[in-house]
């Protein structure tokens, strides 16, 4: 799941002296480097039209060094791409786990199951690292309890709300081959498909 707001969180120090130009140049350089990392990261994320995004991922049965390396790679991609979550299928790995960020901590959840949802639901725009700039309104519960295993195969449970609750529901959808276009209203789906249609010409078969 993409984090649209992070793209706009650039602050600048203001100084009437020579320091202002130096600080401004550093900010511009950092922003440029961040954009390069984002483009490189997104080039490694499977995009709309790739058949792997429609597959239901297989349960994780082996928790080993290979899984740990995948988690590390996916976490780096998630941050570089300015995302708040990334599912294994989005990098072409048909295994049932995703990475996400919660309270400043990088986490992984394998074989996840939502065991409880709150009564309140909210419609909000969602983006996806596999769908470019497309954002569509999606209705989801605002609170969830989700259980699964960490990278070591240990049982874990998280009680989540707000953006993080939305993010884990989004990533769990990915593991079932479901995209945000499937969750939105017909008019928004039609508009999104019109934007995504050119990507189908470039998608692997």
Cite the ranges covered by each PLM segment.
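Positively charged
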Residues: 1-205
């Amino acid at each position: 799941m993409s984090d649209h707001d992070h793209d706009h969180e650039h602050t600048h120090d203001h100084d009437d002296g020579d320091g202002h130009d130096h600080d401004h140049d550093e900010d511009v350089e950092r922003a440029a480097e961040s954009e390069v990392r984002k483009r490189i990261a997104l080039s490694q994320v499977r995009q709309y039209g790739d058949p792997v995004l429609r597959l239901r991922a297989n349960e994780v049965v082996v928790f080993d060094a290979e899984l740990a390396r995948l988690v590390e790679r996916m976490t780096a991609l998630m941050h570089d791409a300015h995302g708040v979550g990334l599912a294994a299928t989005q990098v072409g790995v048909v295994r049932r786990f995703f990475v996400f960020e919660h309270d400043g901590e990088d986490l992984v959840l394998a074989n996840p199951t939502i065991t409880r949802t709150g009564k309140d639901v909210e419609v909000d725009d969602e983006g996806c690292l596999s769908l470019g700039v497309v954002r569509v309104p999606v209705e989801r519960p605002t609170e969830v309890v989700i259980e699964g295993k960490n990278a070591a195969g240990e049982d874990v449970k998280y009680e989540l709300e707000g953006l993080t609750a939305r993010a884990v529901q989004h990533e769990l959808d990915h593991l079932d081959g479901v995209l945000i276009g499937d969750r939105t209203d017909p008019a928004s789906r039609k508009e999104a498909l019109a934007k995504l249609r050119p990507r189908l010409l470039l998608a692997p078969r």
